[in-house]
Amino acid sequence: MASGRDPREPLPGWLEIWDLDREPWDEWLQDMLRDLNEEARRHFGMNMLIRVWNYCVEEGRRHNTPWNEIGYKYYRIVQKSMFVHFRCGCRRRGPFSPYEERRNGQGGGAPPPPPGLA
């Protein structure tokens, strides 16, 4: 280095990394949350997703966290849950139903209604 300059790009500062007020980030996060929630509803159900969201909001309020970071925390938790869920071998493709028949560890809940009443 004859010029004395460091040819490497300098690391961005903390504020540059977490500047969550930029428009593209907001749009990306909203789109990803919409897609992730649509898929997560098929596997976990609304009750669990609402509990996770409430947890993230409570933590965010406790620490005065901006809404974008709260949404991103929710996104990370649900995305990791989906990864583990699929990694454990989920084969579900239909909508989540907490009351479907459970046989040999598959499905969950009460038996299906009798034929003709379904």
UniProtKB/Swiss-Prot annotation:
Q: What family does the Swiss-Prot or TrEMBL record give for this protein?
A: Belongs to the lentivirus VPX protein family.
Q: Which Pfam families match?
A: VPR (PF00522)
Alphabetized UniProt keyword annotations: Host nucleus, Host-virus interaction, Inhibition of host innate immune response by virus, Viral immunoevasion, Virion
**What's this chain's function?**
Plays a role in nuclear translocation of the viral pre-integration complex (PIC), thus is required for the virus to infect non-dividing cells. Targets specific host proteins for degradation by the 26S proteasome. Acts by associating with the cellular CUL4A-DDB1 E3 ligase complex through direct interaction with host VPRPB/DCAF-1. This change in the E3 ligase substrate specificity results in the degradation of host SAMHD1. In turn, SAMHD1 depletion allows viral replication in host myeloid cells by preventing SAMHD1-mediated hydrolysis of intracellular dNTPs necessary for reverse transcription.
Quaternary context: Interacts with the P6 region of unprocessed GAG. Interacts with host VPRBP/DCAF1, leading to change substrate specificity of the CUL4A-DDB1 E3 ligase complex.
Q: Which source organism?
A: Simian immunodeficiency virus agm.grivet (isolate AGM gr-1)
The miscellaneous comment for this protein is:
This is an African green monkey isolate.
Q: Which domain of life is it from?
A: Viruses
Q: Indicate what this protein is called per its UniProt record.
A: Protein Vpx
Localization (cell) = Virion; Host nucleus
The protein's matches in Gene3D superfamilies, at most eight in alphabetical order, are given as: 1.20.5.4730
